[in-house]
């Protein structure tokens, strides 16, 4: 119809016109000003058109050229191609949409909707403009030129921004599926193509490729922006996009969104919020049984480590939740917060939590969305650096100063398939990579005490879940949208602000996850997180053939060393090696046990050496370790061999041979100050051993041994550290009292004390014997400094049967 115009015959049959305009059409005239010249006698619009501001019919490119002194460099390439051509032909074309509301056309109803929206937003300065699809240069583009708009006439900034917006047009054709092409379509184009609203508290947070008008927005000082798609009732065809631009930041979405939706409904139009499809109905509220424990877990994590916010996310389908970002295609992939299973530790971020509650995410978006696709923890050092398409709440995170975030997916054992994702935001001042690593290690202690009603998702479940999801979707006739993988994009980025990593959780139990999670994290030369085993995506991780072929004979070769060294030599991570050991019936890495025996032997040797007049050979401890790889793997056999060898060693250290009927290394034989071998009753011998040890320590110690009576101790508690010296004879009670006094802790019974052993593992101190073992282990360290760690006791954390939370 571009070359012909309709004859304006007053006698034309009205039924013919109704049929012609039923599906909508383009009209063209030589005088575009005639289009909007509604006559009070003929117009059926229930409003005064004089209250509207309309775009000028003449071409505005010349005025803009004069304004900037040159052609606007931000204009789209389609507009550049039309330079030199008479653009008035575009200004003379008008789209008449399908009629469906008491004889009003779609355009008339959109004009009415803009009027209503203007009334709702009259309290503050705002610009309301409509973007509609038009054909230009053989392509379909969105433009706001010659379209209805409204703004505060007293605000020149908005008037200027309106003139700038008229020179932009955005493609409505998605040529590629990558994220970069989606960014180039701009905010209106993304909303038109995605058919879901998009908003930001401040457009100045956009990158230039995401929002081409960002520089002009900064110059005009515009802030909050909301863009929503417009549909006919019962139709999935997007008619256009309404954009609301404000001069103030927009943190809360609900008031403005509800006003716009009501304005559209008043003229028989709608936005994207849809009822739950009947085939997908059926909420599963059984997950609520786990919420009290989750609440306590989040609260304790925030209070212990001063976290600003912790949230719980669940599928919208499980909650039967609706939202403005839902449509028929993405509903089964939409997740949202459980508002009564969140904890706000910092009141200044409460509005951010409310924004998270309003803004649902799709699986794959942000750290939370990625966690729903894996079975291991996901971490980002700075979520505020994500693009809006990768994490829709990135601008809100920037606004509230939130950066580091970690999320983990857990499954409720009572519900079977209901998954929770727990999201923890690190403190605002925790920006340094090393500080974030320490915080992750600290959080691992909390996660070690996760409620027993929750567990991690195994790799097998993850694979089966993917297959069943596809089958269910096909059966219900729902189209799967393309889910963005936000973390793979960051694997090639060297800047720490853009790191989005998936921790290798494997198929570990929750207890193991607590000890391994965050452990061994380091920062490489590119300032990105790494570890010896790497952070591979769990969804892509397969068990290697090498893991399946690691036999007991292979493990025996590494028994003399630490578990970490063995894992590195074999080529697996420590968690995997532990799992392999359990498959072979090895519940504890043997070198740990044998080293304990070795420390006891060394202790006996020191006692013997301190006794005057004692002659004899030293205990052959070196040969004891050398023979260890030949020990049997069976715990019973290992125990018998150790007892046999120890008995032989002790007998060899005395001049007169004697029987060795003892049952353990510490009680198998004894020595007195006269180096006599006692042959009396075993109970007397045990008593004599104890007395002999005390006598030799107090009376017969050499000067060097007396100097060693004091030990250097270094204690870490949260971010604080202290150093002091303690006597070798210190009991656990004395040690705790000394630490509590220095850290000003009133009730130290609520805390656990751990020491760092030779395997670089934290071992709990429960009694005086543990302290004695700790001293023996640490004597072999360079400098002989005992490193201790004070942490909140596990009894202070919520247990499965407790719903009252942390102790006061």
Swiss-Prot record:
One of its GO terms (molecular function) is DNA-binding transcription factor activity. It is found in: Nucleus. Gene3D superfamilies: Phosphatidylinositol 3-kinase Catalytic Subunit, Chain A, domain 1. One of its GO terms (cellular component) is nucleus. Probable transcription factor. Residues 56-68 have a biased composition (Polar residues). This is Protein NLP5. Residues 663-673 have a biased composition (Low complexity). Residues 536-617 form the RWP-RK domain. Keywords: DNA-binding, Nucleus, Transcription, Transcription regulation. One of its GO terms (biological process) is response to nitrate.
């Amino acid at each position: 119809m571009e070359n012909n115009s309709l004859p304006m015959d007053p006698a034309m049959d009205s039924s013919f016109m109704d049929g012609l305009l039923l599906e909508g059409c383009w009209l063209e005239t030589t005088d575009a000003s005639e289009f909007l010249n509604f006559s009070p006698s003929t117009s059926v619009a229930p409003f005064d058109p004089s209250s509207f501001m309309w775009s000028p019919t003449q071409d505005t490119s010349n005025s803009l050229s004069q304004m900037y002194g040159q052609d606007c460099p931000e204009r789209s390439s389609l507009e550049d191609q039309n330079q030199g051509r008479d653009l008035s032909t575009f200004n003379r074309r008008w789209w008449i949409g399908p009629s469906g509301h008491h004889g009003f056309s779609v355009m008339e109803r959109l004009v009415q909707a803009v009027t209503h929206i203007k009334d709702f937003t009259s309290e503050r300065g705002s610009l309301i403009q409509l973007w509609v699809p038009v054909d230009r240069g053989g392509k379909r583009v969105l433009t706001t030129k010659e379209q209805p708009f409204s703004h505060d006439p007293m605000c020149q900034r908005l008037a200027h921004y309106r003139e700038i917006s008229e020179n932009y047009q955005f493609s409505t054709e998605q040529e590629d599926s990558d994220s970069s092409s989606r960014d180039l379509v701009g905010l209106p184009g993304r909303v038109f193509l995605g058919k879901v609203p998009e908003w930001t508290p401040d457009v100045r947070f956009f990158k230039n490729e995401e929002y081409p008008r960002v520089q002009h927005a900064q110059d005009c000082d515009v802030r909050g922006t909301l863009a929503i798609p417009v549909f006919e009732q019962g139709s999935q065809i997007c008619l256009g996009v309404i954009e609301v631009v404000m001069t103030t930041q927009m943190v809360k979405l609900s008031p403005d969104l509800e006003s716009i939706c009501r304005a559209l409904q008043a003229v028989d139009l709608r936005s994207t919020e849809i009822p739950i499809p009947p085939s997908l109905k059926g909420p599963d509220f059984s997950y609520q049984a786990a919420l009290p424990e989750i609440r306590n877990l989040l609260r304790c994590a925030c209070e212990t480590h001063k976290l600003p916010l912790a949230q719980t996310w669940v599928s919208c389908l499980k909650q039967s939740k609706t939202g403005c970002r839902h449509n028929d295609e993405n509903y089964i992939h939409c997740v949202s917060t459980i508002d009564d299973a969140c904890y706000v530790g910092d009141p200044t971020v409460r509005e951010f939590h409310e924004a998270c509650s309003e803004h649902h995410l799709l699986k794959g978006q942000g750290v939370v969305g990625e966690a729903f696709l894996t079975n291991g923890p996901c971490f980002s050092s700075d979520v505020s650096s994500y693009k809006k398409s990768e994490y829709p709440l990135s601008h809100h995170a920037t606004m509230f100063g939130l950066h580091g975030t970690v999320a983990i997916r857990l499954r409720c054992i009572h519900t079977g398939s209901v998954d929770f994702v727990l999201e923890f935001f690190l403190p605002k001042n925790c920006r340094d990579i090393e500080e974030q690593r320490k915080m992750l290690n600290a959080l691992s202690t909390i996660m070690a005490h996760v409620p027993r009603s929750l567990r991690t998702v195994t790799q097998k479940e993850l694979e089966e879940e993917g297959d069943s999801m596809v089958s269910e979707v096909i059966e219900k006739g729902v189209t799967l949208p393309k889910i963005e993988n936000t973390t793979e994009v960051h694997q090639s980025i060297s800047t720490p602000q853009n790191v989005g990593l998936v921790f290798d959780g494997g198929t570990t139990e929750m207890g193991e996850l607590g000890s391994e999670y965050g452990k061994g994290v380091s920062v490489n030369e590119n300032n990105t997180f790494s570890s010896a085993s790497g952070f591979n995506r769990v969804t892509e991780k397969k068990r290697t053939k090498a893991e399946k072929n690691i036999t007991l004979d292979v493990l025996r070769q590494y028994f003399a060393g630490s578990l970490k060294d063995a894992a590195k030599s074999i080529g697996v991570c420590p968690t995997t090696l532990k799992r392999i050991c359990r498959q072979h019936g090895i519940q504890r890495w043997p070198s740990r046990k044998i080293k304990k025996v070795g420390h006891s032997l060394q202790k006996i040797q020191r006692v013997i050496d301190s006794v005057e007049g004692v002659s004899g050979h030293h205990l052959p401890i070196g040969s004891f370790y050398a023979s260890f790889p030949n020990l049997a793997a069976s715990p019973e056999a290992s125990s018998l061999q150790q007892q046999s060898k120890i008995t032989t060693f002790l007998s060899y250290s005395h001049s007169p041979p004697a029987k060795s009927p003892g049952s353990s290394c510490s009680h198998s034989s004894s020595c007195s100050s006269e180096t006599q071998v006692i042959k009396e009753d075993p109970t007397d011998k045990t008593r004599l051993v104890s007395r002999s040890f005390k006598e030799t320590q107090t009376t017969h110690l050499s000067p060097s041994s007396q100097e060693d009576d004091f030990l250097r101790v270094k204690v870490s508690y949260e971010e604080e550290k202290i150093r002091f010296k303690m006597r070798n004879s210190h009991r656990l009670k004395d040690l705790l009292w000394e630490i509590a006094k220095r850290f000003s802790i009133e009730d130290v019974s609520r805390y656990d004390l751990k020491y760092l052993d030779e395997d670089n593992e934290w071992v709990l101190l429960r009694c005086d014997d543990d302290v004695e073992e700790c001293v023996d282990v640490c004597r072999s360290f360079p400098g002989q400094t005992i490193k201790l760690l004070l942490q909140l006791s596990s009894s202070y954390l919520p247990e499965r049967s407790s719903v009252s939370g942390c102790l006061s």
